[in-house]
Amino acid sequence: MSIVLMCAVLSVLGLRLTQLQGFSASTYAAQAEAQRLRTIVLPAARGAITDRAGHTLAQYVELRAVYANPTNVRDIAGTAAKLAPVLDDSTEALRRRLTTDPAEHIKFVYLARGLTPDVAEKVSALGLRGIGITEERGRTYPSRELAANVIGFMRHGDGDILEGGGGLELAYDEVLRGTDGLRRLEANPAGIEIPSGQSREKDPIPGSSLRLTLERDIQWNAQNAIADAVRTSEADGGTAVVMDPRTGDILAMADAPQFDPNNITARDTPALGNRSTRDAYEPGSVNKVITMAAALDRGLITSETPMTIPPFITRGGVRIEDSEPHGVEHLTAAGVLARSSNIGTVEISERVGRIGLEQALRSFGLGARTGLNFPGEGAGLLPAARDWSGSQAATISYGQGMSATALQMASVYATIANGGVRVTPRLVDAITGPDGVVKVTPQPPGQRVVSAQTAATLTRMLEAVATNEGTAPLAEVPGYRVAGKTGTAKRPDPVHGGYQGYVPSFIGFAPADDPRVVVEIVLDNPKKGYFGGQVAAPVFQRVMSFALTTLGVPQPITRPAPLLLDLDR
């Protein structure tokens, strides 16, 4: 019996040995290999972002991260002590990160991130068991705050992957990020690569780069100008937009306050968006240009149409006055615009009618996004004419009771400057792929809004604004003809309702005879001065002067005779 039992045992052992040596050898070998092999992600270089001349605004940088496999670290205290001076960290902090619960079998812990390759090499030279180095994505913004509201910033998303968190970094994230590579290598139990071990690699594919329409120096000047204006007027914020009316190219888009995308803190949160595209405000008198355009284009007025302006009018039970008290005045239509008369504008809008005015507002792009495709862009608010109250039908003609973004209003004036043709604003001029092929961003065909004659007449009327006869002599640019309009809008109070404070602005273009540049300045709730001609016009003058000089725009040779504005003189 014992002999039979022994034979049976030997038979089972033999079968098992045969299984180990033959049938399962490949399986166990594969398992052993899998335990030795590690997969490392090779981050793709994120594409650069430059201005129109190729100056770098955002670029990829090679960074390293130091990690630990706590299960392979034998001497936690000693390892922490050796790493501390290299990583510029405390021994105690590193010791805490290395100390994990054995029951949890944690095999990956970051010890330091965002390191330069030099620091990573020093860590590697220590030869510490259980400590490894991995590549990671890095992003740097050489000019710091310059155009940060446009470029955006980066954040750590799902899986701790660095991705666009705002602005163009977000809008073009898939274009910029590229495709990561992979590396499979053989390592010993301590996590250290075996030099003679097997290794397989798939190269990363870099992301594409963006060339913007921004002009670095014009952007820099606009940022400084709006920041200075916000500070001196004690405003809550401000924005400046500079455009080429012929192409829709945005040469500058500046906000105040700004932030540094290299080092974002909690206090930067309110500044992380883009005021020019996000914030809608009641534009006030800069909107009068649309009312005038509608009347001119329909042949209802000319620049010399006589207008009788009483001290006040009442519409829908609301008393409407001009900014300065006056008796009965006799102005031309050009004078109504130059003096920014609310009363005269309402009377002209009533010739156009509600439906006609709404059509004009929408044809200029109000009530809809501009087509820039910028993250968080707003459309403003333009109610349908059928829903306007009696007072709203009047106030909308001079920019109260509706809202628009700064970019929308800049586009309105660009349309006039472009002979009545509206073009879509652009921020990205071209995309360069990893293969070096440059693809210029196509510009949709322009849309005619008003006739070329209407645009020309309106331009002449707007020239009178930036003179001693108008509301903005401080907007004059020596040597150039400037066409533009002031705005001093009441600011809605989101907490208590009604209005509290003001939003002064100035929008204009130059040279008036051959427009090359549109500049818009908007200040939010200034405490020292609030008229557009007082606080916004000087900022316009500073930004416009610099832009014209930077672009080498020639001065006009002749100037036309001034328009008749006041029939009482």
Give the positions of each predicted feature:
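Hydrophobic alpha-helical transmembrane signal-anchor segments
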Residues: M1-T27
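Small/polar-residue-rich segments within soluble enzyme cores
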Residues: F23, G78-P85, R97-G207, I521, ...
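Short extracytoplasmic
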Residues: Q35-L63
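Short, small/polar residue-rich loop motifs at catalytic or cofactor-binding pockets
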Residues: R36, V41-A45, D180, E234-G238, ...
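Short beta->alpha transition motifs characteristic of CBS
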Residues: Y60-A65, G157, A252-Q258
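Beta-lactam-recognizing serine transpeptidase/beta-lactamase-like catalytic domain environment
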Residues: P189-S199, P245-S285, I290-N525, P562-R569
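Conserved, well-ordered alpha-helix/loop/beta-strand core segments that scaffold catalytic motifs
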Residues: I194-G238
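Short, gly/Ser/Thr-rich active-site loops of penicillin-recognizing serine hydrolases
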Residues: V438-Q443, A537-R569
